Amino acid sequence: EKHLETAKEWVEGEAKQIAYAEEKTRKDIYDAMQSLEYEINTLYTSNGQTPFTTLGFGLGTDWFAREIQKAVLQVRTKGLGKERRTAIFPKLIFALKKGTNLETHDPNYDIKQLAITCATKRMYPDVLMYDKIVELTGSFKTPMGCRSFLQGWEDENGNEVNSGRMNLGVVTLNIPRIALESEGNPEAFWNIFEERLAICKDALVYRVERTKEATPTNAPILYQHGAFGKRLGETDKVDELFKNKRATVSLGYIGLYEAATVFYGADWETNPEAKAFTLDIVKKMKEKTDAWGNQYGYHFSVYSTPSESLTDRFCSMDTEKFGIIADITDKEYYTNSFHYDVRKNPNPFEKIAFEMEYPQYCSGGFIHYCEYPNLQQNPK
Protein backbone atom coordinates (compact mmCIF):
# COMPACT_ATOMS: atom_id res chain seq x y z
CA GLU A 1 0.00 0.00 0.00
CA LYS A 2 2.85 2.39 0.82
CA HIS A 3 4.52 1.87 -2.55
CA LEU A 4 1.19 2.10 -4.35
CA GLU A 5 0.56 5.50 -2.79
CA THR A 6 3.98 6.65 -3.98
CA ALA A 7 3.28 5.28 -7.45
CA LYS A 8 -0.01 7.17 -7.67
CA GLU A 9 1.89 10.37 -7.01
CA TRP A 10 4.65 9.88 -9.58
CA VAL A 11 3.56 7.23 -12.11
CA GLU A 12 0.83 7.52 -14.73
CA GLY A 13 -1.53 4.63 -15.44
CA GLU A 14 -2.95 2.09 -12.99
CA ALA A 15 -1.12 -0.89 -14.51
CA LYS A 16 2.26 0.83 -14.22
CA GLN A 17 1.45 1.94 -10.68
CA ILE A 18 0.68 -1.63 -9.63
CA ALA A 19 3.82 -2.93 -11.37
CA TYR A 20 5.93 -0.30 -9.59
CA ALA A 21 4.41 -1.14 -6.18
CA GLU A 22 4.90 -4.87 -6.70
CA GLU A 23 8.54 -4.46 -7.73
CA LYS A 24 9.30 -2.25 -4.72
CA THR A 25 7.53 -4.67 -2.40
CA ARG A 26 9.41 -7.57 -3.94
CA LYS A 27 12.69 -5.77 -3.17
CA ASP A 28 11.55 -5.11 0.42
CA ILE A 29 10.76 -8.79 0.88
CA TYR A 30 14.13 -9.87 -0.52
CA ASP A 31 15.98 -7.43 1.74
CA ALA A 32 14.03 -8.66 4.75
CA MET A 33 14.81 -12.32 4.03
CA GLN A 34 18.47 -11.49 3.41
CA SER A 35 18.63 -9.56 6.68
CA LEU A 36 17.05 -12.50 8.51
CA GLU A 37 19.62 -14.95 7.14
CA TYR A 38 22.56 -12.68 7.96
CA GLU A 39 21.16 -11.91 11.41
CA ILE A 40 20.81 -15.59 12.28
CA ASN A 41 24.29 -16.41 11.00
CA THR A 42 25.95 -13.60 12.96
CA LEU A 43 24.10 -14.33 16.21
CA TYR A 44 25.94 -16.56 18.68
CA THR A 45 25.27 -18.02 22.08
CA SER A 46 27.79 -17.71 24.90
CA ASN A 47 29.49 -20.93 23.79
CA GLY A 48 29.77 -19.82 20.17
CA GLN A 49 26.83 -21.68 18.66
CA THR A 50 24.43 -20.28 16.08
CA PRO A 51 20.77 -20.68 17.08
CA PHE A 52 19.23 -23.75 15.44
CA THR A 53 16.34 -22.23 13.52
CA THR A 54 14.13 -23.87 10.92
CA LEU A 55 11.98 -22.28 8.22
CA GLY A 56 9.23 -24.40 6.68
CA PHE A 57 7.61 -23.25 3.45
CA GLY A 58 6.24 -24.33 0.08
CA LEU A 59 2.49 -24.29 0.67
CA GLY A 60 1.52 -20.60 0.57
CA THR A 61 -0.02 -19.62 -2.77
CA ASP A 62 -1.03 -15.96 -2.40
CA TRP A 63 1.20 -13.24 -3.90
CA PHE A 64 2.98 -12.31 -0.68
CA ALA A 65 3.56 -15.93 0.35
CA ARG A 66 5.01 -16.76 -3.05
CA GLU A 67 7.34 -13.76 -3.04
CA ILE A 68 8.58 -14.59 0.46
CA GLN A 69 9.32 -18.17 -0.60
CA LYS A 70 11.14 -17.02 -3.71
CA ALA A 71 13.23 -14.58 -1.69
CA VAL A 72 14.18 -17.22 0.87
CA LEU A 73 15.47 -19.48 -1.90
CA GLN A 74 17.17 -16.68 -3.83
CA VAL A 75 19.03 -15.52 -0.73
CA ARG A 76 20.17 -19.04 0.13
CA THR A 77 21.24 -19.74 -3.45
CA LYS A 78 23.30 -16.54 -3.56
CA GLY A 79 25.26 -17.44 -0.42
CA LEU A 80 26.78 -15.43 2.41
CA GLY A 81 29.27 -12.60 1.97
CA LYS A 82 31.89 -12.11 -0.70
CA GLU A 83 32.87 -15.76 -0.49
CA ARG A 84 29.26 -16.81 -1.20
CA ARG A 85 29.43 -19.34 1.63
CA THR A 86 26.55 -21.77 2.15
CA ALA A 87 24.51 -20.76 5.18
CA ILE A 88 23.75 -23.61 7.57
CA PHE A 89 20.96 -21.78 9.37
CA PRO A 90 18.13 -21.22 9.17
CA LYS A 91 17.49 -24.79 8.10
CA LEU A 92 15.17 -24.69 5.09
CA ILE A 93 12.43 -27.30 4.69
CA PHE A 94 10.26 -27.36 1.58
CA ALA A 95 6.91 -29.15 1.71
CA LEU A 96 5.71 -31.03 -1.37
CA LYS A 97 1.93 -31.34 -1.74
CA LYS A 98 -0.35 -32.56 -4.50
CA GLY A 99 -2.27 -29.71 -6.05
CA THR A 100 0.16 -27.11 -4.69
CA ASN A 101 3.61 -27.68 -6.15
CA LEU A 102 4.13 -31.27 -7.36
CA GLU A 103 3.00 -31.02 -10.98
CA THR A 104 3.54 -28.51 -13.77
CA HIS A 105 0.02 -27.06 -13.52
CA ASP A 106 0.21 -26.51 -9.74
CA PRO A 107 0.42 -22.86 -8.60
CA ASN A 108 3.75 -23.26 -6.81
CA TYR A 109 5.46 -25.54 -9.30
CA ASP A 110 7.84 -22.73 -10.26
CA ILE A 111 8.87 -22.34 -6.62
CA LYS A 112 9.56 -26.07 -6.42
CA GLN A 113 11.85 -25.71 -9.43
CA LEU A 114 13.61 -22.84 -7.67
CA ALA A 115 13.97 -25.06 -4.59
CA ILE A 116 15.53 -27.81 -6.70
CA THR A 117 18.02 -25.36 -8.20
CA CYS A 118 18.88 -24.13 -4.71
CA ALA A 119 19.38 -27.70 -3.49
CA THR A 120 21.81 -28.53 -6.31
CA LYS A 121 24.00 -25.61 -5.21
CA ARG A 122 23.49 -25.41 -1.44
CA MET A 123 22.19 -28.84 -0.29
CA TYR A 124 19.10 -27.05 1.05
CA PRO A 125 16.14 -27.09 1.32
CA ASP A 126 15.30 -30.46 2.81
CA VAL A 127 12.04 -31.94 1.53
CA LEU A 128 8.87 -32.98 3.36
CA MET A 129 6.11 -35.01 1.73
CA TYR A 130 2.91 -33.44 3.05
CA ASP A 131 0.70 -36.53 2.89
CA LYS A 132 3.33 -38.78 4.46
CA ILE A 133 3.85 -36.41 7.43
CA VAL A 134 0.09 -36.37 8.02
CA GLU A 135 0.03 -40.17 7.85
CA LEU A 136 2.92 -40.59 10.29
CA THR A 137 2.27 -37.80 12.81
CA GLY A 138 -1.46 -37.16 12.55
CA SER A 139 -1.26 -33.67 11.05
CA PHE A 140 1.09 -31.58 8.95
CA LYS A 141 3.91 -29.62 10.51
CA THR A 142 7.56 -28.91 9.84
CA PRO A 143 10.02 -30.36 12.36
CA MET A 144 11.61 -28.61 15.29
CA GLY A 145 15.26 -28.48 14.31
CA CYS A 146 16.09 -31.10 11.70
CA ARG A 147 13.85 -34.03 12.65
CA SER A 148 11.83 -33.59 15.86
CA PHE A 149 8.13 -33.82 15.06
CA LEU A 150 5.18 -32.95 17.25
CA GLN A 151 2.30 -35.40 17.04
CA GLY A 152 -1.24 -34.41 16.03
CA TRP A 153 -3.10 -32.77 18.93
CA GLU A 154 -6.40 -30.93 19.44
CA ASP A 155 -7.23 -28.43 22.18
CA GLU A 156 -10.32 -28.45 24.39
CA ASN A 157 -12.33 -26.85 21.57
CA GLY A 158 -11.37 -29.47 19.01
CA ASN A 159 -8.95 -27.18 17.17
CA GLU A 160 -5.81 -28.75 15.77
CA VAL A 161 -2.78 -27.03 17.33
CA ASN A 162 0.92 -27.10 16.48
CA SER A 163 2.07 -23.54 17.15
CA GLY A 164 3.29 -22.93 20.68
CA ARG A 165 3.77 -26.59 21.51
CA MET A 166 7.13 -27.96 22.55
CA ASN A 167 9.38 -30.90 23.36
CA LEU A 168 10.52 -31.29 26.96
CA GLY A 169 13.70 -33.25 26.27
CA VAL A 170 15.29 -36.46 25.03
CA VAL A 171 16.94 -39.47 26.65
CA THR A 172 18.87 -41.65 24.20
CA LEU A 173 19.28 -45.41 24.46
CA ASN A 174 22.61 -47.00 23.45
CA ILE A 175 21.33 -50.03 21.53
CA PRO A 176 24.78 -51.41 20.55
CA ARG A 177 25.84 -51.62 24.21
CA ILE A 178 22.81 -53.77 25.00
CA ALA A 179 23.69 -56.09 22.10
CA LEU A 180 27.32 -56.33 23.20
CA GLU A 181 26.34 -57.03 26.81
CA SER A 182 24.02 -59.80 25.63
CA GLU A 183 26.97 -61.52 23.88
CA GLY A 184 24.72 -62.46 20.97
CA ASN A 185 22.04 -64.11 23.12
CA PRO A 186 18.60 -62.87 21.97
CA GLU A 187 16.89 -63.62 25.27
CA ALA A 188 19.57 -61.76 27.20
CA PHE A 189 19.27 -58.85 24.76
CA TRP A 190 15.55 -58.40 25.32
CA ASN A 191 15.92 -58.72 29.10
CA ILE A 192 18.58 -56.01 29.20
CA PHE A 193 16.54 -53.95 26.75
CA GLU A 194 13.56 -53.99 29.13
CA GLU A 195 15.78 -52.97 32.04
CA ARG A 196 17.25 -50.03 30.11
CA LEU A 197 13.82 -48.89 28.96
CA ALA A 198 12.73 -48.75 32.60
CA ILE A 199 15.72 -46.52 33.37
CA CYS A 200 14.88 -44.31 30.38
CA LYS A 201 11.30 -44.04 31.59
CA ASP A 202 12.45 -42.86 35.01
CA ALA A 203 14.78 -40.31 33.40
CA LEU A 204 12.05 -38.96 31.12
CA VAL A 205 9.51 -38.72 33.94
CA TYR A 206 12.12 -36.91 36.04
CA ARG A 207 12.68 -34.52 33.13
CA VAL A 208 8.96 -33.75 32.96
CA GLU A 209 8.65 -33.28 36.73
CA ARG A 210 11.73 -31.06 36.84
CA THR A 211 10.41 -28.89 34.00
CA LYS A 212 7.10 -28.49 35.82
CA GLU A 213 8.95 -26.84 38.70
CA ALA A 214 9.54 -23.75 36.56
CA THR A 215 7.44 -20.65 37.14
CA PRO A 216 6.17 -18.31 34.42
CA THR A 217 8.57 -15.61 35.62
CA ASN A 218 11.57 -17.88 34.92
CA ALA A 219 11.06 -17.40 31.18
CA PRO A 220 8.50 -14.64 30.57
CA ILE A 221 8.75 -14.71 26.77
CA LEU A 222 7.88 -18.41 26.73
CA TYR A 223 5.28 -18.59 29.49
CA GLN A 224 3.78 -15.12 29.87
CA HIS A 225 4.12 -13.44 26.50
CA GLY A 226 2.70 -16.16 24.28
CA ALA A 227 5.67 -17.97 22.70
CA PHE A 228 4.24 -21.24 24.01
CA GLY A 229 0.80 -20.43 22.64
CA LYS A 230 -0.82 -19.23 25.87
CA ARG A 231 -0.25 -16.34 28.26
CA LEU A 232 0.13 -17.50 31.85
CA GLY A 233 -0.10 -15.34 34.93
CA GLU A 234 2.81 -15.10 37.36
CA THR A 235 1.27 -17.64 39.72
CA ASP A 236 -0.09 -20.06 37.10
CA LYS A 237 1.32 -23.58 36.78
CA VAL A 238 3.47 -24.11 33.69
CA ASP A 239 2.08 -27.64 33.50
CA GLU A 240 -0.99 -26.10 31.87
CA LEU A 241 1.15 -25.92 28.72
CA PHE A 242 2.49 -29.48 28.99
CA LYS A 243 -0.28 -31.78 30.20
CA ASN A 244 -2.94 -33.67 28.25
CA LYS A 245 -0.25 -34.62 25.71
CA ARG A 246 0.21 -31.01 24.55
CA ALA A 247 3.96 -31.38 25.06
CA THR A 248 6.13 -34.21 23.84
CA VAL A 249 9.07 -35.86 25.59
CA SER A 250 11.24 -38.24 23.61
CA LEU A 251 12.92 -41.61 23.91
CA GLY A 252 15.86 -41.54 21.53
CA TYR A 253 17.98 -44.39 20.24
CA ILE A 254 21.18 -44.96 18.31
CA GLY A 255 22.96 -47.78 16.51
CA LEU A 256 20.47 -50.26 15.08
CA TYR A 257 23.10 -51.23 12.51
CA GLU A 258 25.70 -52.15 15.12
CA ALA A 259 23.15 -53.99 17.28
CA ALA A 260 22.10 -56.21 14.39
CA THR A 261 25.75 -56.75 13.45
CA VAL A 262 26.32 -58.45 16.82
CA PHE A 263 23.68 -61.05 15.92
CA TYR A 264 23.77 -61.29 12.12
CA GLY A 265 27.14 -60.03 10.92
CA ALA A 266 28.15 -56.82 9.17
CA ASP A 267 26.21 -57.33 5.92
CA TRP A 268 22.79 -57.96 7.38
CA GLU A 269 20.82 -55.31 5.45
CA THR A 270 19.48 -57.85 2.94
CA ASN A 271 18.69 -60.43 5.64
CA PRO A 272 14.91 -60.35 6.35
CA GLU A 273 15.38 -61.87 9.81
CA ALA A 274 17.91 -59.20 10.77
CA LYS A 275 15.71 -56.43 9.40
CA ALA A 276 12.75 -57.78 11.40
CA PHE A 277 14.93 -57.78 14.54
CA THR A 278 15.75 -54.08 14.16
CA LEU A 279 12.12 -53.26 13.43
CA ASP A 280 11.10 -55.14 16.57
CA ILE A 281 13.42 -52.89 18.59
CA VAL A 282 11.76 -49.65 17.49
CA LYS A 283 8.32 -51.29 17.57
CA LYS A 284 8.78 -52.24 21.23
CA MET A 285 10.02 -48.73 22.00
CA LYS A 286 6.88 -47.36 20.37
CA GLU A 287 4.66 -49.67 22.43
CA LYS A 288 6.40 -48.56 25.63
CA THR A 289 6.18 -44.84 24.91
CA ASP A 290 2.49 -45.12 24.01
CA ALA A 291 1.85 -46.83 27.35
CA TRP A 292 3.85 -44.21 29.25
CA GLY A 293 1.91 -41.43 27.55
CA ASN A 294 -1.41 -42.91 28.62
CA GLN A 295 -0.08 -43.39 32.14
CA TYR A 296 1.32 -39.90 32.69
CA GLY A 297 -0.63 -37.66 30.30
CA TYR A 298 2.37 -36.37 28.33
CA HIS A 299 3.14 -37.42 24.77
CA PHE A 300 6.10 -39.80 24.98
CA SER A 301 7.48 -40.34 21.48
CA VAL A 302 10.25 -42.38 19.86
CA TYR A 303 12.94 -40.14 18.41
CA SER A 304 15.74 -41.01 15.99
CA THR A 305 18.44 -39.07 17.81
CA PRO A 306 20.62 -36.98 15.44
CA SER A 307 23.60 -37.57 17.77
CA GLU A 308 26.38 -35.79 15.87
CA SER A 309 28.54 -36.08 19.01
CA LEU A 310 26.81 -39.04 20.66
CA THR A 311 27.79 -41.35 17.80
CA ASP A 312 31.40 -40.80 18.86
CA ARG A 313 30.82 -40.70 22.62
CA PHE A 314 28.83 -43.93 22.90
CA CYS A 315 31.29 -45.75 20.65
CA SER A 316 34.27 -44.44 22.61
CA MET A 317 32.73 -45.53 25.91
CA ASP A 318 31.95 -48.98 24.52
CA THR A 319 35.46 -49.33 23.10
CA GLU A 320 36.82 -48.79 26.60
CA LYS A 321 34.45 -51.42 27.99
CA PHE A 322 34.45 -54.06 25.24
CA GLY A 323 37.57 -53.30 23.20
CA ILE A 324 37.87 -52.93 19.44
CA ILE A 325 35.27 -55.06 17.68
CA ALA A 326 35.16 -55.38 13.90
CA ASP A 327 32.34 -53.44 12.21
CA ILE A 328 31.06 -52.20 15.58
CA THR A 329 33.56 -50.20 17.64
CA ASP A 330 36.49 -50.25 15.20
CA LYS A 331 34.79 -47.54 13.09
CA GLU A 332 35.06 -45.11 16.04
CA TYR A 333 31.42 -44.10 15.58
CA TYR A 334 27.97 -45.62 15.75
CA THR A 335 25.43 -45.34 12.95
CA ASN A 336 22.63 -42.86 13.48
CA SER A 337 19.28 -44.42 14.41
CA PHE A 338 17.97 -46.66 11.58
CA HIS A 339 20.31 -45.44 8.86
CA TYR A 340 21.99 -47.65 6.28
CA ASP A 341 25.69 -48.33 6.90
CA VAL A 342 27.40 -45.49 5.01
CA ARG A 343 30.53 -47.56 4.36
CA LYS A 344 28.55 -49.62 1.83
CA ASN A 345 27.85 -46.51 -0.28
CA PRO A 346 24.22 -47.33 -1.12
CA ASN A 347 22.63 -45.25 -3.84
CA PRO A 348 19.77 -42.98 -2.70
CA PHE A 349 17.09 -45.40 -3.89
CA GLU A 350 18.60 -48.34 -2.01
CA LYS A 351 19.03 -46.27 1.12
CA ILE A 352 15.48 -44.91 1.20
CA ALA A 353 13.98 -48.30 0.33
CA PHE A 354 15.87 -49.85 3.25
CA GLU A 355 14.94 -47.11 5.76
CA MET A 356 11.31 -46.49 4.80
CA GLU A 357 9.76 -48.99 7.25
CA TYR A 358 11.18 -47.41 10.40
CA PRO A 359 9.53 -43.95 10.71
CA GLN A 360 6.08 -45.41 11.46
CA TYR A 361 7.51 -46.49 14.83
CA CYS A 362 9.61 -43.39 15.50
CA SER A 363 7.38 -40.56 14.31
CA GLY A 364 8.68 -38.35 17.13
CA GLY A 365 11.77 -37.76 15.02
CA PHE A 366 13.22 -39.13 11.79
CA ILE A 367 15.10 -38.09 8.68
CA HIS A 368 16.33 -39.79 5.50
CA TYR A 369 19.65 -38.31 4.44
CA CYS A 370 21.35 -38.97 1.12
CA GLU A 371 24.57 -37.55 -0.29
CA TYR A 372 24.83 -36.87 -3.99
CA PRO A 373 27.56 -35.91 -6.45
CA ASN A 374 27.45 -32.51 -8.13
CA LEU A 375 23.91 -32.20 -9.50
CA GLN A 376 24.08 -28.64 -10.82
CA GLN A 377 24.10 -29.90 -14.40
CA ASN A 378 21.26 -32.34 -13.73
CA PRO A 379 18.63 -30.78 -11.44
CA LYS A 380 15.94 -33.16 -12.76
Stretch-by-stretch model annotation:
Residues 1-245, 266-267, 271-380:
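Conserved catalytic cores of very large enzyme subunits
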Residues 249-262, 283:
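Contiguous, well-ordered alpha-helical segments that form the cores/surfaces of helical PPI scaffolds
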